[in-house]
Amino acid sequence: HSLSRRQRQMCIRDSTRLPYDPNLSKKLLAEAGYPDGFEITLDCPNNRYINDEAICVAAVGMFAKVGIKVNLDAQPKSIHFKDLQNGLSDFYMLGWGVPTFDSHYVYSFLLKSDGSWNKVGFKSDRVDELVGTMLTETNLEQRNANIAEAWAIVQDNMPYLPLHHQVISWATKSNVDVPIRTNNEPV
């Protein structure tokens, strides 16, 4: 699941998608000391998201284009998420839905220094401070400014690599009524 500001309450500035540029990627890898790329394992669930393993297979091919050899380890979600929570993965697929449609939900779990799902180790004292204001600031204009500042810091640091936004479509016949919650699950 992408960390897209477009879907959240606080859409302040447009999100800029990074360009697809394999040559720039190779150049940056060389500058970082990896002129010949490197090898890493991508941990991926194979029964949690729609086409999760297929998405990871596609990512493996994309990384290969810039010289990064990715070994795919696709496992059932019961193993995958347990390994993530125990800090046993350095590179992994993680989806994140936001049933509240508010930035605080994303930040408190994924981007706050002590967030329970901040497994990438992202740390920013300023972001932590801004996350605190998301709970207490009652002036909506100021709250949105704080959120925009936090998103700018995160975008500049890129602790996560957003791949896609999973959209689930539901359809029924006119004689069937199935209420759907914001987390895409039927009631």
Model-derived regions, located:
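Alpha-helical scaffold elements lining the catalytic groove of polysaccharide deacetylases
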Residues: 17-21
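Short, flexible, glycine/charge-rich loop motifs used to bind or transfer phosphoryl groups or to couple energy/partner
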Residues: 1, 30, 82
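Short, well-ordered beta-strand elements
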Residues: 37-47, 70-73, 90
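Immediate post-signal peptide segment of exported/extracytoplasmic ligand-binding proteins
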Residues: 22-41
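Conserved small/polar residues in nucleotide/adenosyl-binding loops
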Residues: 1, 7-15
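Secondary-structure transition/capping motifs at alpha-helix termini
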Residues: 33-35, 64-70
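Detector for C-terminal structural segments
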Residues: 6-9, 26, 50-60, 65, ...
